[in-house]
Each structure stands twice: as structure tokens, then as C-alpha cells.
Amino acid sequence: VDEERNHYGASFYDVIIKDLIPMVDKTFRTYTDREHRAMAGLSWGGCQTFNTVLPHMDKFSALGTFSGALFGVDVKTCFNGVFADAEKYNKNIHYMFMGCGSEENFGTEKMAQQLNELGIKLDVYVSPGTHHEWLTWRRCFKEFVPHLFKW
């Protein structure tokens, strides 16, 4: 295992980038380039998706968050300002999806609105009548996955 450790253990993000992706590519018949790699997560996993993909856009070309948002950040400056240059971001990320339930107030819709105002291309899905729950995330998954096979 090739990761940096502190007294809390290995960085989850380093494990994904340095260990999991190479293991998957070595073990399974995958396309190993960024053009064929996406990451998605639900709830805290949605936030982890941002924290994994955005600093490593050389490894991913699509991302999805299901009830995952970043709290208390300026979207123009977070992740070294990756969203500030919408043209560059949109060229690098082929598909971005953010979904949530209509009955949850988790910040997803607010963040999506801010990204739209910056010119970031993304699809937003609001699951009708659902909360921060599995039905929301199953619906988000159903909306997200078909887009991964369009480019």
C-alpha cells in the first residue's frame, strides 16, 4: 500500500488514487484513461467525490453527487479555483451531475445554482417527494449512469 499515514490512518483520497484505481485497472478489463473514468457518491460520499475528483481531474472525466454538497466554501475559490475558469473546467469534465431529494435541505441545489452562475455545465436532478434517503439515491443513480455512456 502506497499512502501517507498520520495517526488517523491513511488518507481515503490517496488510497482511491494510488491503490484502488491501479488495482481495479490491473484486475479487470477496463479502459485505464481518464476519459473512461467517473466517480459518484451519495451523502458524505458525494462530498468525498468532490474531494477526490476535483484535485485529480487528470484521472477522471465525470462525477456525480447524490445529496452531496460542499458547505461553507466559496465555489469560486475552493479546490484551487477549479470552478473559476468555467471554460477550462467544462472542457475537462465531460459530465457533472448533482442530485438530491425535494424534501432535504442539504445544500445541493444552492451549490448547483452557484455553479450554474459561474458557467459550469452540470445536470441537476431533484427527486420528487423524497428526503436524504435510499429512494433519492436510487433515482439519482438511474438518472446519472446513462450519461456516462454518451461520449
Task: State where each predicted segment sits.
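Non-catalytic cap/lid and distal C-terminal segments of serine-dependent acyl enzymes
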Residues: 1-151
